[in-house]
Amino acid sequence: IHGNAEALKAVLRKEPDYDFLVFLGDSVLSGPQPKETAEILLDVKPDINIMGNHDEILLDHLLIDEWPEDWRAYNQWAFKQIPSEIIEITKTYSFSDKYEIGGVKFFLHHGQLDRSIPAAIPYADTSSFEALDPGNDCELVLFGHNHIQFTHELGSKTYINPGSVGQPRCGRTHACYAVFEDGKYIPRQVTYDQRPWISALDKIDDLRQYPKFTSWLKEGFLAGYGIGKREPWIRFHEEGYF
């Protein structure tokens, strides 16, 4: 979600009736609507929460000590906006585990791997996917982190990334998510108004001394390239990924 309340609201409007809600991590950081996003999450209360790397930062601010100054300022501002309740709930998030939902067994993982292992994205080696769930026998593995909506078949297993609600990277401006209906996986996307996100970013006084950084954030967000228009995201855009 990455602190994008507008995208989250759009998903919930499109899917008002659900039996079970799974969140795969990265809730309120790094985005300009951390408080609003936190309040929505406190209201909807996902049934399962998986710990993302940005959720870890929320619990341990020292993890950003070596980040660039502008990114540190962005996150330090966000830390001050977040309700204590969401911090306490974040402490209960799981890193990864097996779950049975509606009679279907899943292995859930945020998707962050050791830096020595290439990211689990389309065309990645088998080893990247196997690193997500070593020793696990679940045939369905759900993960996030890489902000691209895709599935990967490996033997009897299906690896599923439902994409990013709040920070797409493949040159599209949709909020991405997925549903399971009657045991069938359905990837979905929904458009939303980007202006409130931009307005929220413009109101962050702590970033006024970093105009190039805020311009870069806006350009990437409006173009659907959350971390910049570059490979492999340009290729993924051309191939139709969300």
Model-derived segments and their meaning:
Residues T126-I160, V165, A175:
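Anionic-ligand binding region
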Residues E153-F242:
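Acidic, His/Gly-rich catalytic cores of divalent-metal-dependent hydrolytic chemistry
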Residues K98-F107, L154-T158:
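Beta-strand-turn-beta hairpins that frame and shape the catalytic cleft
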Residues L21-D26, I48-N53, H109, L140-H147, ...:
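Active-site neighborhood of phospho(di)ester-bond hydrolases with catalytic His/Asp-centered motifs
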Residues G3, L29, L113, I148, ...:
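Short active-site segment of divalent metal-dependent hydrolases/proteases
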Residues E66-A73, V104-G135, P168:
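Active-site-proximal segments of metal-dependent phosphoesterases and phosphodiesterases across multiple
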Residues S96-K98, L108, T151, Y177-V179:
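Conserved hydrophobic/aromatic beta-strand scaffold that supports enzyme active sites
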Residues G3-I87, K91:
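Core catalytic region of metal-dependent phosphoesterases/phosphodiesterases
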